[in-house]
């Protein structure tokens, strides 16, 4: 097996930007996606990292996504913001809307941002991290393609439907979790397939409805929700609030308009942000200290780690050592870029 190719984070960004521009994507979108992928790789979130570049390029070349669409920000009310992504990729739309969301939440105490008509492929923790670093509690929800069966079923009806929550953490490191409501993200299963690995039991069923550990069969069949009916209910919640609530597509509707190029699905994204300084009563420092105590007491128990701790550790390693890219993936990306086109 060929040795992995080691790249600095700056080289990851350049690789992404150059590959996307060579495919015909506009500079602003290419830079935003490059930032998104680089953040994912820095935190060793490979399912949303360089591997996703293949899908982005496919959607540019197929004409599915608008290459030069500039997102438009509008204010429905002082606390409700909207970004029309105009059939473009989500990262630039997120970068357009989140600063306004932060400002509105700090002014009013609570604010929401709906992003419409976007192709979303990125990790949600990165979407809300700026708001949490600004001292806000924040949530984010998005709907994916129809590939998950509801609890007890075997036919896809729901998306992987991830959501994220963040809280301003101690030492400037926010408490953020981000996970799919399926047993695993579809990207994780795709990486298992590419690597020739099995998936754990309970993640999916094959096209015949029988449980499977074959990732190819899982992708052809249906993923399962985590936690049975609990994960299924949470997935439906995400469908409702990131779909009909904001006037965007459900996962089933998204799949119906999908062209099969392997790129990101079309849909919407909902953000909610609350400023503890405005929203709560009593002394803010005391309330934040109560939260810090909760984190400290949890970590004091052997075997406990908080969400996002591993990402921050990975981030420190990546800044120093760069990242390792599987040789086969690097060769595939090189073929997509300026040298291969």
Curated annotation (Swiss-Prot):
Is Transmembrane helix among the key words of this record?
no
Mention one GO biological process in which this protein takes part, according to its record: proline metabolic process
Which Pfam families does this one have? Ldh_2 (PF02615)
- Keywords from the UniProt entry: NADP, Oxidoreductase
Q: What is its EC number?
A: 1.5.1.49
Q: Which InterPro entries has this protein been placed in?
A: Mal/L-sulf/L-lact_DH-like_ah (IPR043144), Mal/L-sulf/L-lact_DH-like_NADP (IPR043143), Mal/L-sulfo/L-lacto_DH-like_sf (IPR036111), Malate/L-lactate_DH-like (IPR003767)
User: Catalytic activity annotated for this protein?
Assistant: L-proline + NAD(+) = 1-pyrroline-2-carboxylate + NADH + H(+); L-proline + NADP(+) = 1-pyrroline-2-carboxylate + NADPH + H(+)
Into which family does the record put it?
Belongs to the LDH2/MDH2 oxidoreductase family.
Role: Catalyzes the reduction of Delta(1)-pyrroline-2-carboxylate (Pyr2C) to L-proline, using NADPH as the electron donor. Is likely involved in a degradation pathway that converts cis- and trans-3-hydroxy-L-proline (c3LHyp and t3LHyp) to L-proline, which would allow S.novella to grow on c3LHyp or t3LHyp as a sole carbon source.
Q: Name it.
A: Delta(1)-pyrroline-2-carboxylate reductase
């Amino acid at each position: 097996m060929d040795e992995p190719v080691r790249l600095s984070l700056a080289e990851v960004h350049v690789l992404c930007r150059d590959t996307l521009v060579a495919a015909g994507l506009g500079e602003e979108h290419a830079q935003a996606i490059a930032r998104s992928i680089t953040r994912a790789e820095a935190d060793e979130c490979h399912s949303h990292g360089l591997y996703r570049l293949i899908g982005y390029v496919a959607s540019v070349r197929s004409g599915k996504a608008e290459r030069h669409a500039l997102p438009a920000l509008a204010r429905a009310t002082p606390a409700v913001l909207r970004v029309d992504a105009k059939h473009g990729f989500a990262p630039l739309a997120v970068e357009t809307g989140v600063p306004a969301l932060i400002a509105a939440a700090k002014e009013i105490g609570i604010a929401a941002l709906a992003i419409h008509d976007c192709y979303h492929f990125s990790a949600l923790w990165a979407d809300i991290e700026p708001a949490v670093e600004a001292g806000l509690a924040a949530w984010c929800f998005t709907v994916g393609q129809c590939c998950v069966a509801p609890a007890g079923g075997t036919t896809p009806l729901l998306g992987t439907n991830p959501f994220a929550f963040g809280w301003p953490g101690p030492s400037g490191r926010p408490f953020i979790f981000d996970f799919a409501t399926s047993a695993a993200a579809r990207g994780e299963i795709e990486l298992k397939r590419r690597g020739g690995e099995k998936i754990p039991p309970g993640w999916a069923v094959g096209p015949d409805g029988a449980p499977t550990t074959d990732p190819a069969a899982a992708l052809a069949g249906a993923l399962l929700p985590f936690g049975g009916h609990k994960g299924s209910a949470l997935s439906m919640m995400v469908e409702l609030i990131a779909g009909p609530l904001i006037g965007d597509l459900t996962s089933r509707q998204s799949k119906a308009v999908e062209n099969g190029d392997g790129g990101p699905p079309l849909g919407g994204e909902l953000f909610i942000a609350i400023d503890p300084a405005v929203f709560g009563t009593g002394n803010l420092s005391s309330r934040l200290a109560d939260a810090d105590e909760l984190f400290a007491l949890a970590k004091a128990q052997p075997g406990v780690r908080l969400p996002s701790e591993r990402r921050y550790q990975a981030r420190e390693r990546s800044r120093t050592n760069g990242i390792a890219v599987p040789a086969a993936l690097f060769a595939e990306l090189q073929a997509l870029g300026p040298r291969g086109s």
